[in-house]
Amino acid sequence: MTSSSSDRSPLASQLGEVPAPLYARVKQMIVSQIQSGAWPPHHRVPSESELVSQLGFSRMTINRALRELTSDGLLVRMQGVGTFVAEPKGQSALFEVHNIADEIAARGHRHRCQVITLGEEVAGPERALALDVREGQRVFHSLIVHYENDIPVQIEDRYVNAAVAPDYLKQDFTRQTPYAYLTQVAPLTEGEHVVEAILAEPAECKLLQIERGEPCLLIRRRTWSGRVAVTAARLLHPGSRHRLEGRFSS
């Protein structure tokens, strides 16, 4: 397939001439658009069919380029919506506990959240062990999705010792995060983290607006105030939108 420079699409004219696999040339073209600022964060990337039409390459070539750029964290593919330029990855300190709303604000971005569940449950064996309470004792449960500039970046699945925070269910967590409230009523003195790489459940993929099979980063966190367990949380992040960072010295 040949075309003159006058009838090439604007995107096709950005393709490099250096010999390389076609998918690699498509990737480099998209990266150049992002790095130049022509496609800023949240910019909608042309669909596969649009790129096939504009670049003259096969759908398989375009799909591979988009898939690899998503895996690299440069693009975000949202089911039923489209593909968008990703924000630079959010990061959290590996062994510190911070308010996710503050982390997002520190990056100059907007935080909001959606409360999916907020209620009371009876502690079964697993919850009782995690919170150091008796089986059958009441505990509070909240399930919240946190957004950074309207892109879901974390599912916070949290169980709380009701005896420590009896007014937990009365809070408006669209105005302050559970972390912010709990640090007021039961200041953190000790924490425990377990970090895993997992595949999210289908319902979690829907909440995070990711495709099934996308790797996720899971942080299991327990915190104490004095010698009393306050909360046990499961924090799930899309791997393409989050990273952990730590530093140590000897």
From Swiss-Prot:
This is Histidine utilization repressor. InterPro entries: Bact_HTH_transcr_reg, Chorismate_lyase_/UTRA_dom_sf, His_ut_repres, Tscrpt_reg_HTH_GntR, UTRA, WH-like_DNA-bd_sf, WH_DNA-bd_sf. It comes from Pseudomonas aeruginosa (strain ATCC 15692 / DSM 22644 / CIP 104116 / JCM 14847 / LMG 12228 / 1C / PRS 101 / PAO1). One of its GO terms (molecular function) is DNA binding. One of its GO terms (biological process) is L-histidine catabolic process to glutamate and formamide. SUPFAM superfamilies: Chorismate lyase-like (SSF64288), Winged helix' DNA-binding domain (SSF46785). Pathway: Amino-acid degradation; L-histidine degradation into L-glutamate [regulation]. Keywords: DNA-binding, Histidine metabolism, Repressor, Transcription, Transcription regulation. Residues 48-67 bind DNA. PROSITE patterns: HTH_GNTR (PS50949). Residues 20-88 form the HTH gntR-type domain. Repressor which binds to the hutP region in the histidine utilization (hut) operon. It blocks the expression of all the hut genes in the absence of inducer. Pfam families: GntR (PF00392), UTRA (PF07702).
